[in-house]
């Protein structure tokens, strides 16, 4: 059974369609929302968001943080940042990873280490999702970043 799903950021409406399900990275682990799901508001952590749309196709997104609200047989996701896996620029993600790693290793006391950790985790998530969705691509150096 289908239900409406909306995905929003502060900048745009990313997705607004009827879906069969959405699988999200909750703060306590992944969970799936189907039609007639119980009412819930949950925090989301960085990870992969998977949608099964009305054509039974799987759509994959990388999400940073946000929350999901499920009520009255509909779901809304508010995300700090989200992008379709097809939009991931893996070279840019690799550069972000390397910049964040340099900031974390910097002896400079003025470097915001928490911000650098978040940047590093976002870059790792983007690389991991890219490799997961494109298994035919062999990026040994990228896989090494995930260790």
Curated annotation (Swiss-Prot):
Q: Which GO terms describe its cellular component?
A: plasma membrane; proton-transporting ATP synthase complex
> What topology does the record note for this protein and the membrane?
Peripheral membrane protein
Q: Which UniProt keywords apply?
A: ATP synthesis, Cell inner membrane, Cell membrane, CF(1), Hydrogen ion transport, Ion transport, Membrane, Transport
Gene Ontology molecular-function annotations: ATP binding; proton-transporting ATP synthase activity, rotational mechanism
Compartments, record wording: Cell inner membrane
Q: What InterPro entries does its record include?
A: ATP_synth_F1_dsu/esu (IPR001469), ATP_synth_F1_dsu/esu_N (IPR020546), ATP_synth_F1_esu_C (IPR020547), ATPsynth_dsu/esu_N (IPR036771)
One Pfam family this chain carries?
Answer: ATP-synt_DE_N
Query: Where, by residue number, does the polypeptide cross the bilayer?
Result: none
Q: Which family does it belong to?
A: Belongs to the ATPase epsilon chain family.
Q: What does this protein do?
A: Produces ATP from ADP in the presence of a proton gradient across the membrane.
Q: How does it assemble?
A: F-type ATPases have 2 components, CF(1) - the catalytic core - and CF(0) - the membrane proton channel. CF(1) has five subunits: alpha(3), beta(3), gamma(1), delta(1), epsilon(1). CF(0) has three main subunits: a, b and c.
NCBIfam families, A to Z:
ATP_synt_epsi
The molecule here is called ATP synthase epsilon chain
Q: What is the native source organism of this protein?
A: Protochlamydia amoebophila (strain UWE25)
Source organism phylogeny? Bacteria, Pseudomonadati, Chlamydiota, Chlamydiia, Parachlamydiales
């Amino acid at each position: 059974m289908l239900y409406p799903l909306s995905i929003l950021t502060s900048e745009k409406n990313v997705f607004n369609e009827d879906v069969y399900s959405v699988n999200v990275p909750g703060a306590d682990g992944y969970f799936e929302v189907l039609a007639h799901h119980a009412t819930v508001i949950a925090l989301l952590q960085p990870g992969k968001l998977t949608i099964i749309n009305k054509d039974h196709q799987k759509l994959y997104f990388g999400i940073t943080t946000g929350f999901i609200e499920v009520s009255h047989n509909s779901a809304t996701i508010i995300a700090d940042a989200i992008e379709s896996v097809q939009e991931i620029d893996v070279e840019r993600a690799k550069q972000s990873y390397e910049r964040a790693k340099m900031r974390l290793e910097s002896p400079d006391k003025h470097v915001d280490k928490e911000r650098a950790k978040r940047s590093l985790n976002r870059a790792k998530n983007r690389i991991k999702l890219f490799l997961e969705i494109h298994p035919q691509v062999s990026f040994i150096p990228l896989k090494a970043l995930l260790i």
